[in-house]
Amino acid sequence: MSDLYRFGISLDRELIEAFDRHIKGQGYQSRSEALRDLIRNELLRKTTAEGGLVAGAIVMTYDHHKRELVNRLIDIQHDFHDLIISTQHVHLDHENCLEVIAVKGNAPDIEKLSSALKVLVGVKHLDLSLSSAD
């Protein structure tokens, strides 16, 4: 027996036409694929809001010449060592670095780590991307 379930939904014509344009622009091959992603994203939002277990990445660029910035970044990462799985450091040019921090833990704790890093002077950009950990 298949693990796939089929069901029907009723939508206003304007809504389904807008949805079809959207998913075509995103490159989806079918409404089913797009709907699965929407459902997964909504469930992830719920998990995140409830403080559930998530995994993800913090991606940031920063100026490593800023006084004490590198030391503060390392200190903060050690403060949150239980959330950090690994880090990757890339030298973009003479002044700028890219750091990718793989994380796993409760969403609010990961968001605290992300916020602590984002507000440091010299951090040019930071993006947090979360996904389900199960």
Curated annotation (Swiss-Prot):
Residues binding Ni(2+): 78, 89, 91, 97
Keyword annotations from UniProtKB, A to Z: DNA-binding, Metal-binding, Nickel, Transcription, Transcription regulation
CC cofactor note: Binds 1 nickel ion per subunit.
SUPFAM superfamilies linked to this entry: ACT-like (SSF55021), Ribbon-helix-helix (SSF47598)
One GO term (biological process): response to nickel cation
Keyword Nucleotide-binding: no
Pfam families: NikR_C, RHH_1
Descriptive protein name: Putative nickel-responsive regulator
Gene source species: Chlorobaculum parvum (strain DSM 263 / NCIMB 8327)
